[in-house]
């Protein structure tokens, strides 16, 4: 039976206590020119910052080339990093210099890891894992974390924290998470998940059909799939014209069985970023189901020219799909230093469409706390300052079946400011307990 979409509980937010760069161009030839004789040295702070940004933007891809869609040209990763440094700083660094710098950092990181590992067996496994990795993979913390997790084995603490930057003492950076889900260049394809097996194996029995392709490859449990999520600023110019800016956005996609499964992050690494009491992340995960928990890292786009006037609207929209007809409740908790600041609870009916049930939370207003937070963030003079603030800012979104109280989706959001001119980016992870 077709229901009517709509909100049936209060939309109000409640508190738990009470109410840059140069535009100089240059292709392969420019990148191979000698170093400029700048007094700051080969890897001055501005070059190092751009280098770290480029590492996050372009994941290791071996000997393969990357095609830039806006140019149609093919580049190697080191060439892209050199190109990025040139565009951001106006200073030329060659591909060979980039390669050499990556090797230096890889050796430094390998020494740090060996120094931290006390157990000889774990040290031997770590050395074996690192021997099979390229320098680029070692300093790509996403790949490195996956490899070291295998080397540690169950019950061993993480070698380096999820929140550490690529270099010791580097303020405001967390390049351990890739901004792009570039499946072609996945460093280490994750293993299939329990309950999410690909149909490429033995033919399933009629009573056990294969899981749909979006399970394990997007923000989706066996009961609910997030199709879209966005936070935005909108301003009406006239009755028919709106200016809209997306701060963060997860767009609709159509995963296939050939796509890789999501990478995993140990949930214990982010426990301190979210409330610990009943209804907090740890409590929810212990109750399960385990396939409903995700981490989304957003690189938020704060670069907007829309004037913040009285007619401006700050909102959030999201869309979900389910094979079941139910009433869902969506709780959104804004957290600072791991403590809840405000919460909003919305309840939605299903709408039957094309053989499934859809749920839409459309243009839900942002609370005053969030609007003020965005204002203050935008007025900080440097991106590293913004990232330093955002390191202690998180959002926990929990979607439940209103009648059974079953957790359908639990999404932990963490943030940085986008350093790209291409707008907001994101990367999605499964949360697991290794």
Swiss-Prot record:
Residues 201-213 have a biased composition (Pro residues). It comes from Homo sapiens (Human). Keywords: Activator, DNA-binding, Nucleus, Transcription, Transcription regulation. Residues 1-28 have a biased composition (Polar residues). Changing residue 373 to A: Reduced transforming ability. Changing residue 429 to A: Important loss of interaction with YAP1 and complete loss of transforming ability. Changing residue 297 to A: Important loss of interaction with YAP1 and complete loss of transforming ability. SMART domains: TEA. It is found in: Nucleus. This is Transcriptional enhancer factor TEF-3.
């Amino acid at each position: 039976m077709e229901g009517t979409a709509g909100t049936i509980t209060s939309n109000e937010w409640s508190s738990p206590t009470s109410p840059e760069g140069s535009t100089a161009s240059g292709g392969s030839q420019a990148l191979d020119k000698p170093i400029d004789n700048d007094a700051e040295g080969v890897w001055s702070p501005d070059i190092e910052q751009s280098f770290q940004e480029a590492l996050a933007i372009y994941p290791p891809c071996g000997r393969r080339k990357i095609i830039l869609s806006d140019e149609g040209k093919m580049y190697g990763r080191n060439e892209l990093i050199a190109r990025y440094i040139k565009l951001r700083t106006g200073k030329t660094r060659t591909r060979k210099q980039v390669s050499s710098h990556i090797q230096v950092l890889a050796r430094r990181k390998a020494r740090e890891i060996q120094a931290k590992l006390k157990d000889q067996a774990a040290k031997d496994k770590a050395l074996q894992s690192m021997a099979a990795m390229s320098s680029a993979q070692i300093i790509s913390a996403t790949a490195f974390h996956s490899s070291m997790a295998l080397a540690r084995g169950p019950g061993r603490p993480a070698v380096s924290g999820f929140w550490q930057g690529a270099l010791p003492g580097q303020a405001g950076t967390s390049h351990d998470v890739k901004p792009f889900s570039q499946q072609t260049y996945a460093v280490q394809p994750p293993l299939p998940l329990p309950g999410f097996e690909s149909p490429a194996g033995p033919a399933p029995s009629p009573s056990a059909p294969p899981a749909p392709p979006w399970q394990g490859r997007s923000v989706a449990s066996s009961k609910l799939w997030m199709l879209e999520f966005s936070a935005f600023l909108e301003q009406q110019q006239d009755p028919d014209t709106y200016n809209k800016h997306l701060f963060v956005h997860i767009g609709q996609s159509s995963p296939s069985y050939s796509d890789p499964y999501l990478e995993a992050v140990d949930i214990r690494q982010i426990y301190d970023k979210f409330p610990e009491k009943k209804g907090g992340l740890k409590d929810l995960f212990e109750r399960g189901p385990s396939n409903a928990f995700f981490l989304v890292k957003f690189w938020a786009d704060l670069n907007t020219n829309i004037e913040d006037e009285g007619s401006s609207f700050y909102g959030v929209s999201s869309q979900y799909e389910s094979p079941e007809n139910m009433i869902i409740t969506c709780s959104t908790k804004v957290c600072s230093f791991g403590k809840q600041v405000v919460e909003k609870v919305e309840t939605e009916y299903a709408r039957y469409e094309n053989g499934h049930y859809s749920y839409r939370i459309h243009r839900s207003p942002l609370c005053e706390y969030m609007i003020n937070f965005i204002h203050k963030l935008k007025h900080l003079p440097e991106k590293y300052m913004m990232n330093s603030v955002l390191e202690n800012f998180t959002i926990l979104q929990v979607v439940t079946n209103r009648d059974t109280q079953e957790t359908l989706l639990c999404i932990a959001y963490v943030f940085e400011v986008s350093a790209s001119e291409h707008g907001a980016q994101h990367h999605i992870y499964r949360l697991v307990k290794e």
